[in-house]
Structure formats: C-alpha cells, structure tokens
Amino acid sequence: MDVLFIALLVAPLILGQEYDHEEQLEEGDYYQVAYYYYTVTPNYDDFSVNFTVDYSVFESEDRLNRLNKEVTTTEAVETTASSYSLHTELMDPQNPVTTKPVTTEPVTTEPVTTEPQSPNQNDAMSTLQSPVSCFLLWTLLQGGVHFM
C-alpha cells in the first residue's frame, strides 16, 4: 500500500521533468499562429436536413383531423338513420363499408380548483444524498486513513 502511495506521488514528478537533450521551441515558434478563414455555405438539395419549421405539415394534419371527425360524425348519423330504415339494402362484397359508433364524453364547464399545497419539511432533505451513500463514503475515508 505504501509503494502505491509513493508511486502516485512520484509519477507526476518524473513525468514533469525537463531533459536537456530535448528540442526547445523558440519564442517566435511558440507564438506563431496560423489564421484560417472559411465560410459556411448551406447546401440546399433534396437529401439534406432543413432546419426551418414547415407549418404546412401541421396545418394539413389539423385539416385531416377535422375531416376525420366530420367523417365519423356523418358515419354515425348514417348508421343511426340506416338502423331505423324499414328496407334492407344489398351488401356489396367487393366494397364493404365499416362504420364505427361515435361516443362523446360530456363537457363540464366547472372551473378546476386545486388545493394550495403547504411545503413539506421533508422536501428539503430530498435534494440531499441518501444517508446510506454518506455513510458509505465516510467508512471508505476512515478505512483509507486507517491503512495509511
């Protein structure tokens, strides 16, 4: 254990030594800096990533959602109307029509109220480390001091 401790102390001293036969840099070489100027030109082709937000995708998605809602409501009306009709229609086996019943949830207009929450005294301790990890760190430090 003592050998490892000494090796850890001596290694930076050995590695940080300067040797006489090394090539030294001149002051002019040390401060010589090359400047490179470049410009970034964006490439607009079909395969590159476009970082602009295209809102038309969102608008078309909203339109599709609206149309889907309109179709489901009209299908529901047709389903209820056809269930009350007295005559039967022939089914076309090549073009089956499937209808889904539409269920709607009642909309409440009551305001949502939340109760004021009082701060808990244990909230301050939740940001600290758990006592197990603190105890483990303390035992490791005590063990390290004991072996030195």
UniProtKB/Swiss-Prot annotation:
InterPro entries for this protein: DUF4634
Instruction: Give the range the annotation lists for the signal sequence.
Output: 1-16
Provide this UniProt record's keywords sorted from A to Z. Answer: Glycoprotein, Secreted, Signal
Which GO terms of type biological process are on file?
epithelial cell proliferation involved in renal tubule morphogenesis; phosphatidylinositol 3-kinase/protein kinase B signal transduction; response to wounding
Taxonomically, the superkingdom here is: Eukaryota
> Gene Ontology terms, cellular component aspect?
extracellular region
Annotated glycosylation sites: 50
Q: Does the keyword Signal apply?
A: yes
Pfam families attached to this UniProt entry = DUF4634
Q: Where is this region: Disordered?
A: 91-125
Q: What is the name attached to this protein's record?
A: Uncharacterized protein C1orf54 homolog
This protein's species is Mus musculus (Mouse)
